[in-house]
């Protein structure tokens, strides 16, 4: 398969349904996200609108006009932690293994720095070696392990806590 052409753009209202469908597709693989399906469309729409309204970094990758990946960074809710953001990212299975993930990550991290974030953190399943390698290449470091933190289909998985200081 050849490297698909794609474009990384800030998310807009017109991308909400595609974003929701992409999240649902990745979630249903039961491996990459901490959910088994996307939240209701209305909840996804409010998440996106809130990110747009508040200027939180959220980007999508478009291929053939369709959302094939996303990356967002939202601030921690508590005032004492709000200088830090939590990163979420996903790529449709059909578009993995190219440069989409790194391109999205670069865009979101650059915007996070402009927005004044000082720390970005994430959790990743310990067996998701490709994602861990991507994060390490971007400068994330492991801070710890949450043992048996995720349960998928009756099996427990450790989650790796990673962070990047901006």
Residue spans for each PLM region:
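Conserved acetyl-CoA-binding loop-helix of GNAT-fold acetyltransferases
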Residues: 91, 97-114, 132-137
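Terminal substrate-recognition subdomain of acyl/acetyltransferases
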Residues: 2, 155-166
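Conserved G/P- and acidic residue-centered "switch" motifs that form tight phosphate/ATP-binding loops
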Residues: 65, 99, 128
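Short amphipathic helical patch at the helix-1/turn junction of helix-turn-helix
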Residues: 91, 125-126
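A short beta-loop-alpha structural element at the N-terminal edge
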Residues: 6-21
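Acetyl-CoA-dependent GNAT
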Residues: 10-13, 27, 31-94, 105-107, ...
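Conserved catalytic-core motifs of GNAT/GCN5-like acyltransferases
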Residues: 119-125, 136, 141-157
């Amino acid at each position: 398969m050849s490297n698909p052409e794609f474009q990384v753009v800030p998310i807009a209202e017109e991308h909400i349904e595609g974003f929701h469908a992409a999240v649902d597709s990745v979630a249903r693989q039961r491996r990459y996200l901490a959910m088994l399906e996307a939240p209701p469309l209305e909840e996804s729409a409010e998440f996106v609108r809130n990110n747009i309204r508040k200027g939180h970094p959220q980007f999508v990758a478009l291929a053939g006009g369709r959302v094939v990946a996303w990356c967002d960074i939202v601030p921690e809710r508590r005032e004492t932690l709000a200088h830090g953001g939590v990163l979420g990212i996903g790529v449709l299975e059909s578009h993995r293994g190219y440069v989409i993930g790194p391109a999205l990550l670069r865009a979101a991290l650059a915007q996070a720095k402009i927005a004044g974030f000082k720390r970005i953190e994430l959790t990743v399943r310990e067996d998701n070696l490709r994602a861990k390698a991507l994060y390490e290449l971007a400068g994330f470091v492991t801070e710890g392990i949450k043992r048996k933190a995720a349960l998928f289909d009756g099996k427990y998985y450790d989650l790796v806590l990673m962070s990047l200081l901006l």
